[in-house]
């Protein structure tokens, strides 16, 4: 896995990226345009096991000509690393070994709550807010990373 700075060196300016918000039951997936200006939700997949998810991820990467992967890293609010961060780190290492594109972790603190709050500001009802929260969180994660990469 690469730091976000090393990922920037490995990809060119016209590279599409994927963002992942990996949960215990669902994985939110987002994608950005080839100019890396805006991230948009792509889909949410039910998580059964990592092997099946990696097969689906490889298809998404191939179909969309993806050049890099940003995975949300759930660091605790105090900056420490808990069980969730360790779980994501372990899964990310396996994903990194199985796919042929650079992978980087991105601090996802508050991504799910931010996605939920944005939905509420758009006056979306509670059931619709929670329905696609994972892919919205993945979008928030990816947007933060591409904003950083573009500066």
Residue ranges, per PLM feature:
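Phosphate- and other anionic-substrate recognition elements at nucleic-acid/protein interfaces
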Residues: 1-18, 25-151
């Amino acid at each position: 896995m690469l730091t976000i700075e090393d990922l920037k060196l490995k990809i060119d300016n016209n590279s599409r990226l994927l963002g992942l918000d990996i949960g215990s039951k669902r994985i939110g997936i987002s994608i950005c345009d080839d100019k890396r200006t805006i991230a948009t939700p792509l889909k949410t997949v039910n998580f059964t096991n990592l092997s099946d998810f990696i097969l689906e991820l490889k298809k998404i990467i191939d179909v969309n000509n993806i050049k890099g992967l940003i995975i949300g890293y759930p660091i605790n609010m105090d900056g420490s690393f808990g069980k969730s961060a360790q779980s994501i780190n372990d899964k990310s290492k396996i994903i990194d070994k199985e796919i042929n594109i650079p992978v980087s972790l991105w601090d996802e603190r508050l991504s799910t709550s931010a996605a939920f709050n944005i939905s509420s500001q758009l006056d979306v009802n509670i059931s619709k807010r929670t329905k696609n929260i994972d892919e919205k969180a993945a979008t928030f994660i990816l947007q933060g990373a591409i904003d950083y990469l573009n500066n």
